[in-house]
Design a protein with these regions (language model features):
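Carbohydrate transferase catalytic cores enriched for Leloir-type hexosyltransferases
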Residues: 1-232
């Protein structure tokens, strides 16, 4: 995020005059008890992997499905995958092209998910998959972390900046890397809990209060500077 914006704006402004103010996210997303009465509307499982996919190439859906196929070959648990915002025909095209129809029985694809149900779905997920090719910010990462769910995010564009150094980042062009990170979470309980705790702490940095306070601080600094003198 910051790097891309800075590269554009420094063509016209000195870098010292640029300050990044991060978005917040809805406080509706927070650590909460499991809600099977909600999650069962979308997937018939107590535990699952969660992916917000669509037909936009940047969401990296084909590689996520390849990674999931690799996961099924190596996992003892074989957790099902909940895919939001993607219709069955779109999934079928990918599975047929990649010769992966054998994994379809492990997939749940309810299509559109109500925003009011998202927090429960994040909370019920074993992990949230977000290995996009690029994102300008990545609010779903923060929503999932705030719900106590470990994330697996791409190591490109704004995602490392927002997710932070302690997050589980992957090469989004490598299904094998995505597979390995899912298995790392599944096979290492201590590491899994560390990711839960890291995400809860990291997500607290992105409240709308912090956004407002950052903006207020900038406005105060500008009002005391000579950057925009007031004419009398």
């Amino acid at each position: 995020m910051k790097g891309g914006v800075y590269r554009i704006l420094t063509l016209h402004l000195p870098e010292k005059q640029l300050v990044a103010v991060y978005n917040g996210f809805n406080s509706h997303f927070h650590l909460q008890p499991k809600a099977p009465e909600i999650t069962r509307k979308y997937i018939d499982a107590d535990e699952y992997l969660f992916f917000l996919g669509n037909t936009d190439p940047k969401k990296n859906t084909p590689r996520v499905l390849k990674a999931y196929s690799g996961y099924l070959k190596k996992s003892a648990k074989k957790l099902p995958l909940l895919i939001a915002d993607l219709k069955e025909d779109a999934i079928d095209r990918i599975l047929e092209e990649e010769k992966m129809m054998d994994i379809k029985s492990y997939l749940s694809f309810p299509g559109y998910i109500e925003n009011t149900d998202l927090a429960a779905l994040y909370s019920g997920a074993f992990a949230f998959l977000y290995p996009s090719l690029r994102e300008s910010f990545g609010i779903p990462m923060l929503e999932a972390m705030a719900c106590g769910t470990p994330i697996i995010a791409g190591n490109t564009s704004a995602m490392p900046e927002i997710a932070g150094d302690g997050a589980l980042l992957v090469d989004p062009f490598s299904p094998e890397d995505i597979t390995a990170k899912i298995l790392k979470l599944e096979n290492d309980g201590t590491f899994y809990q560390q990711q839960v705790e890291y995400g809860l702490k990291r997500s607290q940095m992105f409240s709308w209060r912090n956004t407002a306070e950052s903006l207020l601080s900038i406005y105060k600094e500008l009002s005391l500077s000579n950057i925009c003198p007031v004419s009398k």
